[in-house]
UniProtKB/Swiss-Prot annotation:
Ca(2+) 3 binds at D94, D96, N98, Y100, E105. This is Calmodulin. The keyword Disulfide bond does not apply. Ca(2+) 2 binds at D57, D59, N61, T63, E68. Keywords: Acetylation, Calcium, Metal-binding, Methylation, Repeat. Ca(2+) 4 binds at D130, D132, D134, Q136, E141. SMART domains: EFh. Ca(2+) 1 binds at D21, D23, D25, T27, E32. GO terms for cellular component: myosin II complex. Residues 8-43, 44-79, 81-116, 117-149 form the EF-hand domain. One of its GO terms (molecular function) is calcium ion binding. Pfam families: EF-hand_7.
């Protein structure tokens, strides 16, 4: 879901994430979330903060990492997703511009996003999106993956 964001949006969210991640350890805790929300004039309870974290905490470790944060932001923007945004996202992944996303290109972009993926995990992501079985993802397959509910 986060891969439907443009490079510019991802950069903006990285900045926002850094504002929350006070100690710079790559995760947002309930304490850090509370600090930022209070600085924005909100007054969430500890339980509310925990609920907000749990909502996006995919791996269940009690904190939000950047990929989880991106997923949350992407969800909020999902309704405004246009064909142009999807095409732009495809271009971000299709580094050599040949119309296909290879495993190497996917790995490169994911690594730049701070995702440390094994070759198996990258191959698995390609397989899931690769409808025609050619080992890479073309634009149509990418659109299918991005618009799948």
């Amino acid at each position: 879901m986060a891969d439907q964001l443009t490079e510019e949006q991802i950069a903006e969210f990285k900045e926002a994430f850094s504002l929350f991640d006070k100690d710079g350890d790559g995760t947002i805790t309930t304490k850090e979330l509370g600090t930022v929300m209070r600085s924005l004039g909100q007054n969430p309870t500890e339980a509310e903060l925990q609920d907000m974290i749990n909502e996006v905490d995919a791996d269940g470790n009690g904190t939000i990492d950047f990929p989880e944060f991106l997923t949350m932001m992407a969800r909020k923007m999902k309704d405004t997703d246009s064909e142009e945004e999807i095409r732009e996202a495809f271009r971000v992944f299709d580094k050599d511009g040949n119309g296909y996303i290879s495993a190497a290109e996917l790995r490169y972009v994911m690594t730049n996003l701070g995702e440390k993926l094994t070759d198996e995990x990258v191959d698995e992501m390609i397989r899931e999106a690769d409808i025609d079985g050619d080992g890479q993802v073309n634009y149509e397959e990418f659109v299918q993956m991005m618009t799948a509910k």
